[in-house]
């Protein structure tokens, strides 16, 4: 049985991108994909792919590879059990309640889009949420439950507002610095010489770059997950490989530094190596890899500390222990140790960070939302500072649309989740800004190891 839908939502078929005609076999699809799916199931057809089982499926070439087209039908959530075995017209009526529920979600989504002033035809572009005065946690030392008062971040000054509310930074960035060298595909290694051993290469043989896990499963087990989020899941760095590389780096003796590094110095080294994995991740991201290096640098120099903070916070959500924080190396640090050894400012920052961990935990943020939010952070700079405005703006709108669609579909009982997640991004921005200030003052005092990517990023906004 086919069900009508609201045409003013201007839905596109999740399989091929054609205009949808109604609800067919579990979700909104076009007539062509509806008929293809029905014939495939009823006739028990088996296809093979002559390429690598990764063919592009769109309106113009959806008939070229039936194997990949059918796999995509299953991936986006079309239901095998909804096809009638008796070859009669109409789907199975037991899916009626599901269609009605989906229609209700579409109505709710439409209302939310209109309430936030998003564009219906291209997906939402982020409007700024209410500003909040959240003091923040350091990018390198967050952790700990509780809420301790901390001095608020300074006024934005000449900062410009990014697409989800908090300020971005206007920058005139040269394309010849160390980060530029690292971003060029022809120079994948570090272009600056660190006082610490290079984890990517040794005098004897080059080490492989940070590894990525096998592609995230994208079959029928993940129905209703937007394609952008599926791609981002595939690009997530492997936590085990990152842990092993950082541990190896920490265990090697420091060149020209016979003295034992301080705990804070070790934390900075962890952050520096994590930052390299973040750059590797960004280089592989859809849209980002299509930008010119100058634009890539502007984006990374704008959001590097946010990505570090967010990476740490999500690790604590997965860790799930209130009395300790989990480092990227897999080591646990008791909060009592932090309280005893850290200064008052650092301790208050740690407590503020853990409060954000608790907020996101209460929102039940999952891995799909995490990767989408991380992508939004990467593209948080106001597009007017970029050469390729259109590409970056398109990335922002697609990510917002994907996150809204995902939260509405998978958390219909939390109708406000999309907005709440964006508010948390504003807090992450605030946290990272204060963390940068803390780290910069530590650097001026000689407590942060010099000549590395972390220091380069610290100076980027101050040049």
Swiss-Prot record:
The modification Phosphoserine is found at residue 202. A 1,2-diacyl-sn-glycero-3-phosphocholine binds at residues 343, 438, 442. A zinc finger (NR C4-type) spans 13-33, 49-73. Expressed in the pre-granulosa and Sertoli cells of the ovary and testis, respectively. In the testis it is also present in the interstitial cells. In the adult ovary it is expressed in the interstitial gland, and in the granulosa cells and theca interna of small to medium-sized antral follicles, but is not expressed in large antral follicles. The modification N6-acetyllysine is found at residues 34, 38, 72. It comes from the Eukaryota. Residues 10-85 bind DNA. This is Steroidogenic factor 1. GO terms for cellular component: RNA polymerase II transcription regulator complex. Binds DNA as a monomer. Part of a complex consisting of SFPQ, NONO and NR5A1. Interacts with NR0B2, NCOA2 and PPARGC1A. Interacts with DGKQ and CDK7. Binds to and activated by HIPK3.
